[in-house]
Amino acid sequence: MPSTPSGEPVLYLFFSGTHRRPRSFIAFGLDLFNTAFRRNRFDFGDPEVLARLESMVPVIGNTLYASNSHVLNQGLKASTAIIKCPLKELEKSVPVFVRQTIDILKEIGSTESEVAQTALKSLAMIVRDKANAEVKEKDLVYLLELLAPDLEEPGRQASVFAILRAIVARKFIVPEIYDLMDRVSEIMVTNQSPQVQELCRSVLLQFLLDYPQGKGCLRTTMAFLAKNTAYMYESGRISVLELLSAIVSKFEESLIGDYADLLFVALVMVIANDDSAKSREMAAEIIKNLFLRLDVDHRQLLVSHVRSWAGQKENSQLTRVAVQVYGIMLDALQTNVSTYLPSMIDDLNLNILRSVEQLTKEEEDQTDIDSQWQVVYHIFTVLGKVIRIYPDVATRPQRLSWTAVVEHLLFPHAWVRMAAARLLGQLFSMLPVAEPPKDGYSTTSPLAGLNLKDIAEKHCTQLKSSRLSPTLGLQIVKNLFYIGKCFCAAKVSGPQPAMDVENENEDEDDPGEGDSEHEEANSDNPLAWLFSKLSYQIRSAYIARRSCSADCVSEFCLYIDGSHSRADRKIGTSNPLPYFASSRQWQTTWRPLCCKNS
């Protein structure tokens, strides 16, 4: 075999007309050419190679007129390969390739045969890659009619979608393509194959972006997509959400604004009703992107919907989803949500107060609690986001209903208790340690209306739970530590007398007995009351191997030992808190605990 100056072999194919050579020889030569091209054996930088390839263009074109199916199949593959070469001869040969390939399809009359499948793939490559490859309108109509029955045939979908993508990419416009795209939209939803759904979404998105869409036509498409966000099968819903995500990202803002209301309501219903976590997450992400793409006026329209839903007292599910959307808004807009922040906080406060009303009913129905906890949990979660973005909201007097938050510390559902404790922890982290005023906090204080002793008592009650989670236990310890530091800052008239051993032994048997007497005795010393309260729980906590109460006491002792200089006490050598409990209690419980943790 001859070679180029660089030493690379050159492949010669001799054709003197398809009627003069045996068909098998012609098919073999075409197959040899296709194999050489597939293995990159042609050096396009070599003028000699290009000159020889130039002479092959009309020869390959002649094979498209062969009557033998094997020769025709190899010739179609060769035409697909040769158009990728930088050859001048292709300028006049490409239209011939296109016309003859369409004639082959017309002669066959269906897409079932191997030759027809190869012809479709070849035509798709030529139309896609060559700008001078034109398709007449009547031929385009014929192709679309030929493709329609095979859109859902698994064995032929690859070639069908290949030619369809090529047609859409070249923006060939005939009325029939709009009808075909309606079919593609349906297949995108109903087909169970992820690969087919991806092909449909790709073609449909390109069609929506590049083709003229009248308002009526586009609205019909958007309504179809919005409706099918509630399709019966998860795969179909996810396919629709994938396309909606691309639409919201790539459409012009003016178009998104026109259909924002329609899409927003559909997506919110997905969050409210869909049993698939993936669908709900995708809908939330699309809503987030939707808020970012909209102008102020359209954004305000959506917020008005959310406010309306948040005010639905009798429909807790609608209230819940409204609160969730507020959280999505915060995630999307961050500091740009300030315009809507006052109304948002009003809605959240209103629903917290409603929840308090439910809790204070004398005969509460458990099913009501079950339906209410999600609303409250999401409210506290959203308020946590608000405080992270706008810290002044937490410390501004009478902005948030903190008293209502405290009322939920003993809510029947653990998630709500956790969210309420975490929210209080955020508040405490922003406030300096200060002595609680005896007459209560003023209306100008962030803690207005709150009673630290009441909060501490609720936290202590939570610590008794056998189902206390480590996360909630840690948050309670943090909150009690802040409250304890505030109590430590309080001035006391003198040390509290220790409890006698007899009373202490009684308390060990029944920790709740005598609490009222201790509270009365410790009314001027809240820290003593708190230590007494926790000391009753430490013994049972050790037995149950729940260490939150012990951790809390340990932190108090270490804090007092390290920072309360006026006491001038040393942990481990003497009782630093002689007025908190008896010396026996210090020696048997607190001293070993503090020495262990210090």
Language model: regions and residue ranges:
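HEAT/HEAT-like alpha-solenoid repeats
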Residues: 3-15, 47-61, 91-106, 134-151, ...
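N-terminal "cap/leader" segments of large eukaryotic alpha-helical scaffolds
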Residues: 1-38, 536
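Extended amphipathic secondary-structure runs
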Residues: 382-400, 462, 466-475, 479-482, ...
